[in-house]
Amino acid sequence: MGNVLAASSGAPGSGASNLGLGLQEPAPLPSNSGSLTESSSSAEGLDSLAAAKDAALENPGTVEELHKKCKDIQAITFEGAKIMLNKGLSNHFQVSHTINMSNVVPSGYRFGATYVGTKEFSPTEAFPVLLGDIDPAGNLNANVIHQFSARLRCKFASQIQESKVVASQLTTDYRGSDYTLSLTVANPSIFTNSGVVVGQYLQSVTPALALGSELAYQFGPNVPGRQIAIMSVVGRYTAGSSVWSGTLGQSGLHVCYYQKASDQLQIGAEVETSLRMQESVATLAYQIDLPKANLVFRGGIDSNWQIFGVLEKRLAPLPFTLALSGRMNHVKNNFRLGCGLMIG
């Protein structure tokens, strides 16, 4: 519920080459020790160059955010009618009331609450963050996000249905100066001896290139052989206003491309291949922003011949936002329409 976003090549070759020649062809030192001074200057130059290169590398974010640019412009459609009322009770506490009427998802009322703490690490981020929603039957979705230091952040999510914890997940991210290390534990159970552990590492190689890997390990009685491990390699390349990102592993291939064509238009392309299911899906999406009209439109089409889009229009000066959603599947010959109103 909140908004968040060069190494100097110089001439290192000459300094390193001179130093190398000096080592290969040693000569008697003159009485004024000029060679020592020159060698020391060359070494200092190399050290300063390496320091400048390291300083230019920034934290690459997490592997979870690898495809974020492309995913953010894709339309999230809904069916039926939805009304949401957001009310801020203070600078740190907000509540929401949502009424949903649909034939696809369960209809009814949900109450939500969000608390943002006072521990600030940037002008746009404060911790801890507690958010969740609950329906009259007691089904609960809860999330807790806390940043313990400038580099260490933890996220916990849990889902409760019919008085039972059906899903839980704890993620810890350590953000170094030019790398991020993440560890996730999901659905651990000492009664069934099952769970999922995922380790991720992402390293900035150059200011434009980040490479990393992911290891997922699952164990339990329902897993073939009682345990399975999947290794993947990930990467992201940024060039100006475009971003290439990809994941390659035993389970399949996932490639995304994002381009900011202008201040009003963003486009993205995604190809996801599952080796286990022996299928691929390609998606082309775009987002149009018209600030003067208070309008945002997200649309797209995929290789399954589905066309989808969401239109969001802010009804200024009133604190209302109108949302219209549509999805058409030409293969199955069905159409879903949604209409929503957000107040506050």
Curated annotation (Swiss-Prot):
The keyword Transmembrane is assigned to this record: yes
UniProt-listed Pfam families: Porin_3 (PF01459)
GO CC, one annotated term: mitochondrion
Biased composition, class Low complexity, residue ranges: 1-23, 31-44
InterPro entries, A to Z: Porin_dom_sf (IPR023614), Porin_Euk/Tom40 (IPR027246), Tom40 (IPR037930)
Transmembrane segments: none
Domain of life: Eukaryota
Keyword annotations from UniProtKB, A to Z: Ion transport, Membrane, Mitochondrion, Mitochondrion outer membrane, Porin, Protein transport, Transmembrane, Transmembrane beta strand, Transport
Primary role: Channel-forming protein essential for import of protein precursors into mitochondria.
GO molecular function terms attached to this record: porin activity; protein transmembrane transporter activity
Chain spans, region Disordered: 1-44
Lipid bilayer topology: Multi-pass membrane protein
Subunit structure: Forms part of the preprotein translocase complex of the outer mitochondrial membrane (TOM complex). Interacts with mitochondrial targeting sequences.
GO BP terms, alphabetized: cellular response to hypoxia; monoatomic ion transport; protein import into mitochondrial matrix; protein targeting to mitochondrion
Protein name listed in UniProt: Mitochondrial import receptor subunit TOM40 homolog 1
Alphabetical list of Gene3D superfamilies matching this protein: Porin
